Curated annotation (Swiss-Prot):
One of its GO terms (molecular function) is ceramide binding. This is Ceramide-binding protein svf1. GO terms for cellular component: cis-Golgi network membrane; cytoplasm; endoplasmic reticulum membrane; nucleus. Transmembrane segments: none annotated. Pfam families: Svf1, Svf1_C. Keywords: Cytoplasm, Endoplasmic reticulum, Golgi apparatus, Lipid transport, Membrane, Nucleus, Transport. Ceramide-binding protein that may transfer ceramides from the endoplasmic reticulum membrane to the cis-Golgi network membrane, and is thereby required for the biosynthesis of complex sphingolipids. InterPro entries: AttH-like_dom_sf (IPR023374), Ceramide-binding_SVF1 (IPR051385), Svf1-like_C (IPR033394), Svf1-like_N (IPR013931). Gene3D superfamilies: AttH-like domain. Its main location: Golgi. It is a peripheral membrane protein. Belongs to the SVF1 family. GO terms for biological process: ER to Golgi ceramide transport; response to oxidative stress.
Length: 380
């Protein structure tokens, strides 16, 4: 019956047994003293399109000089090698707090395909292309006539993945992992272009970041909690992605993050933390909604200087609380819906009372106000 149980849990998302922390190989194990991270090449950025259960996402966050905050995302998912779907999401946040709903579009994509090098993606009325030099993505979408997207993200600092390949592996046999979680980042981008809605043309000239993720397993098997921050100041970009595994993998915390400036990664590594310093119980979701978070980065530059950085302070009123089960496409929901005890909610923030990045590199100290987008996700 065990094979049936594990197959069922892979496809239907039932709970996993307790394997313990030995059954996870965090990405930090790939780091060496002289190679804590890898600078990304064009080849690293290719879509994988694996033929087993996995979800691949390319997510672009834009913070326009005029204050507009946007997330655009392509999701490519394969369920048990039998069903492939692609989805395009675009969210224009209302940061004014006046109660006007965010502009949110989520559309299935049809006839999707990749170019020969697997670095560009297309489907009916949408294309995402990586240029020849591998330093700019252009996204054009007319999938939904209510939201016409024409954006270019130019890499302003090198991209990075932690260790050799940015991947945490799951499984009791490290040589044959049964699951994985990978992240790659362009922490600092210059954004140009527009998003046209029925109401107006949004000029998106400004700053941004790009995150590529690949979950080679059921999302709720890999993580029970997530914390994410994208913090952009005139001179620096600070990003962090942290997840905590369910008890089946020892409630292990995996944290990847980095700090960049134009042309340079100052630090990238795993010795970072995200601490919810204040929270209150959210009645709708029954999760402890964070009110204040302290983000800390600690490590060394390439040439051995000590780096410490923090962003700390009140998050202000949340932008949004997303009931994931209400949002996900139907097919994925039926597969995820049988999860015992999973109640996935995402809380999103962008403090309008701006917070500051405090950064110390060697003996030099910097403090700069910045634009922030962050998420706290609770799953189980």
């Amino acid at each position: 019956m065990n094979w049936l149980k594990s197959t069922l849990s892979a496809v239907a998302g039932t709970q996993e047994p307790i394997y313990g922390p030995e059954a996870i190989q965090p990405v930090s194990q790939q780091q060496t003293e002289d190679a804590p991270y890898t600078e990304l090449t064009k080849h690293d950025l290719r879509w994988r399109a694996y033929q087993y259960t996995n979800v691949e996402t390319q997510t672009y966050y834009a913070m326009a000089d005029n204050g507009t905050l946007v997330m655009v995302q392509i999701i490519y998912s394969n369920i048990a090698g039998i069903h492939t779907t692609a989805q395009f999401n675009c969210k224009i946040f209302n940061t004014s707090g006046d109660g006007t709903p965010h502009i949110w579009f989520s559309d299935p994509l049809y006839n999707h395909m990749f170019d020969e090098s697997m670095s560009s993606f297309a489907a009916d009325n949408i294309s995402l292309s990586l240029n020849e030099e591998g330093n700019a993505y252009t996204l054009k979408s007319a999938v939904n006539e209510g939201c016409l997207v024409d954006l270019t993200f130019n890499r302003a600092a090198p991209g990075f993945a932690i260790g050799k390949d940015g991947t945490t592996y799951f499984g009791t046999d490290p040589q044959n992992p049964w699951g994985s979680m990978r992240h790659m980042f362009w922490p600092r981008c210059n954004v140009t272009g527009t998003i046209t809605t029925k109401e107006k043309v949004h000029d998106m000239t400004g700053r941004g970041m790009f995150s590529q993720a690949l979950q080679g397993m059921k999302p709720h098997h890999a993580a029970s909690r997530w914390n994410f921050i994208n913090f952009q100041t005139p001179s620096f970009s600070a990003i962090m992605m942290e997840f905590t595994t369910p008890p089946s993998y020892g409630s292990t915390v995996v944290n990847v993050g980095g700090i960049a400036k134009d042309g340079e990664i100052i630090y990238a590594g795993t010795t970072n933390s995200a601490t919810h310093t204040e929270a209150s119980q959210d009645e709708t979701s029954d999760w402890p909604e964070p009110k204040s978070i302290k983000w800390v980065w600690e490590g060394k530059t390439k040439d051995g200087k000590t780096v410490t950085a923090e962003v700390d302070g009140p998050l202000g009123p949340k932008l949004d609380r997303i009931d994931v089960m209400a949002e996900v496409p139907g097919f994925i929901k039926t597969i995820a819906g049988s999860v015992a005890g999973a109640r996935p909610y995402i809380f999103q923030y962008s403090p309008q009372q701006k917070l500051s990045l405090k950064l110390k590199v060697g003996d030099e100290e910097f403090t700069e106000e910045g634009s922030m987008f962050s998420e706290a996700t609770f799953i189980s």
